[in-house]
Amino acid sequence: MKSSLVILYHREPYDEVRENGKTFYRDKTSPNGIMPTLKSFFANAEQSTWVAWKQISGKQQENFQAKMAFPGQENSVVHRIPLSADQVKNFYHITSKEAFWPILHSFPWQFTYDSSDWENFKQINEMFAEAACEDADDDALFWVHDYNLWLTPYFIRQKKPNAKIAFFHHTPFPSVDIFNILPWREAIVDSLLCCDLCGFHLPRYVQNFVAVARSLRKVEITRQVPVDEHAFTAVGTALAEPEITTQLKYKDHLVNLDAFPVGTNPTQIRAQVEKASTQERIRKIREELGSNKLILSAGRVDYVKGTKEMLVCYERLLERRPELQTKVNLVVAAAKAASGMRVYKNAQSEIERLVGRINGRFAKLNWTPILLFTSALSYEELLGFFGAADIAWITPLRDGLNLVAKEYVVAHGCDDGVLILSEFAGSAVELPDAILTNPYAAKRMDESIDQALAMPVEEQQRRMKSMYQAIQRYDVQQWANHMFREAKATAVLGKEPTPV
């Protein structure tokens, strides 16, 4: 039986574990993120296929099983594309992370062209399309995820002209002058214009894509509407946008556009936070700190995350306000990037250097200003810090959304706590009750941490309640529902978009 739904995602939907010479497949350990939600839609389809890549060695190639039944679900198939270590390196570690990533995040000086392997990237995207089409109905819905698979819609459209193709962009989409630095810009845009629906986190990213498309191709804007101000801040902050283009026409093909940011899973997060083991973890952290304020910064090592700027601001805080020495503690959870990700090595070294300098300058016999974790914390450990932290300091220089900010709010519910959030994180236009700051401006950063430390409990609770309610209204399930609803309706000419 052919699949009516095909999900294309660079990760497999489970963890493969070897124990005692046997292979087991287990759910991803984090209860949050989009994976559980995608899997629920995947399982509920009459017949579905999930396409991902799998790195294998030459020895494994001979006995490699490309198609596997989804554990416990006979109607679902995982189609794994075997890639060699060199293919993965060139496709993911170099071309995706050293060429595309810096452009998407508006860091053009980090862009690498010479080592990029465009032909390898094209080949792997075509392999994804071939695998996706192999078992798909002629009118199947293909849901393609993220920039790693930019070219896949084009190859699918060649093979399945009547298919519905939806694409969701999980990163920022930059301004036209930045995106057009990419030497392969025309091929990327041509592929995205093959889609029936292109989804982005924010109206700003939609408008940036429209500007790029109009700069390279003769596209017609066929529908533009005011931004839904119940969902997004329309004016007054860095990523605000008052209007959104919701449909383009190119060569008699309609491309629907929409903004619907990924949500969290508040129910699961709250259940985990309220577990006795998590509450005990929170209690122990608070007991160890005493009356000290706990500030938390969490995120992987990446030059776009603004960790360096945050650390320098913390150093200024201890200089400006010496009375806070021994009264505040900063926990930095900055997990090292996976091996092979050479682009992040300098960022890691800079973080470690700054933490060493600050601790060396200000540490007392009974107080260390910063506790740095460079190994990944378990989700349970991270939730313990979320629950214990008085302040979450999330100030990326650029971020498509930033789910950590939402997770911190959910961990606190309607209780006290303060979120400092960069204006350049996509979630800032969803969470106006955070303390929004500009990580490029030292004075604004100083003012934001001072405001957070001084905020009365009543104001903390009011702001947190407002943010928590917003996150509850548009959780990860609503995000996926929205995507499927809009994708299935794309064939209706002139259809009005459903509000977020």
Curated annotation (Swiss-Prot):
GO terms for molecular function: alpha,alpha-trehalose-phosphate synthase (UDP-forming) activity; glucosylglycerol-phosphate synthase activity. Gene3D superfamilies: Glycogen Phosphorylase B. Induction: By salt shock. The keyword Nuclease does not apply. Keywords: Glycosyltransferase, Stress response, Transferase. GO terms for biological process: glucosylglycerol biosynthetic process; trehalose biosynthetic process. It is an enzyme of class 2 (transferase). Pfam families: Glyco_transf_20. Its EC number is 2.4.1.213. It catalyses: ADP-alpha-D-glucose + sn-glycerol 3-phosphate = 2-O-(alpha-D-glucopyranosyl)-sn-glycerol 3-phosphate + ADP + H(+). Pathway: Glycan metabolism; glucosylglycerol biosynthesis. Involved in salt tolerance by producing GG-phosphate from ADP-glucose and glycerol-3-phosphate (G3P), an intermediate in the synthesis of the osmolyte glucosylglycerol (GG). Belongs to the glycosyltransferase 20 family. This is Glucosylglycerol-phosphate synthase. It comes from Picosynechococcus sp. (strain ATCC 27264 / PCC 7002 / PR-6) (Agmenellum quadruplicatum).
